[in-house]
Amino acid sequence: MKLKSKLLLSCLALSTVFVATTIANAPTHQIEVAQRGMI
């Protein structure tokens, strides 16, 4: 159980970092497309 929560937390952290870098590097229209893809 502990391993699963650690894995989940790592995945969450990775996706947060990925989204943050994408937003930092991408022009506005790409961000809008990414947000639509998440919904």
Swiss-Prot record:
Induction / repression: Part of the rapF-phrF operon, which is controlled by ComA. Transcription of phrF is also regulated by the sigma-H factor.
GO biological process: establishment of competence for transformation
UniProt keyword 4Fe-4S, yes or no: no
Residue ranges crossing the lipid bilayer per the database entry: none
Function: Signaling molecule involved in the regulation of genetic competence development. Secreted during production, but the mature peptide acts intracellularly, indicating that it needs to be imported into the cell to function. Stimulates expression of the genes controlled by ComA, a transcriptional factor that regulates the development of genetic competence. Acts by inhibiting RapF, which regulates the activity of ComA.
Organism whose genome encodes this protein: Bacillus subtilis (strain 168)
Assigned keywords, A-Z: Competence, Cytoplasm, Secreted
Further information: RapF and PhrF pair of proteins acts synergistically with RapC and CSF in the overall regulation of the ComA transcription factor. CSF, PhrF and PhrK stimulate ComA-dependent gene expression to different levels and are all required for full expression of genes activated by ComA.
Positions annotated as propeptide: 1-34
Family: Belongs to the Phr family.
Pfam families xref list: PhrC_PhrF
GO cellular component terms given for this protein: cytoplasm; extracellular region
Predominant place of localization: secreted
Posttranslational mods: Contains a predicted signal peptide cleavage site in the N-terminal region, however the propeptide is probably subject to only one processing event, at the N-terminal end of the mature peptide.
Localization: Secreted; Cytoplasm
Quaternary assembly: Interacts with RapF and inhibits its interaction with ComA.
Protein name (Swiss-Prot/TrEMBL): RapF inhibitor
UniProt keyword annotation of Transmembrane present: no
